[in-house]
Amino acid sequence: EAICGVSPVLMRPPGGYIDTRSLSVVGNMGMSAIMWSIDTRDWQHRNAQRTIDTVLSQVRDGDIILMHDIYSTSADAAVVLIPELTARGYQLVTVSELAAYRGGAAPGHKYSQFR
């Protein structure tokens, strides 16, 4: 909050690991835990085409896609995926925008998609 000027309301647990106790703490802090419905495993294979294929074969409305911006292959995949998903009728939004559109995210709850 001191750095960005607002209190965070969403958090992604490192590695996607969160237990009941941690989720309770997150909720007491007014936050929801955000997971993902499509894991591209881009960190493991570092292959742009494989990332593209994974997303395009699995994507559905309301999905949260996990990709890591620290790999050039993930950035290369995004350059292809963004126009392709848009052409298929998807609107790319932030998780906050997606949650708000689908009724919001309750503190102390875990979400991997919003449908």
Q: Residues of each region from the PLM?
A:
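Catalytic domains of cell-wall/extracellular-matrix polysaccharide-remodeling enzymes
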Residues: 1-112
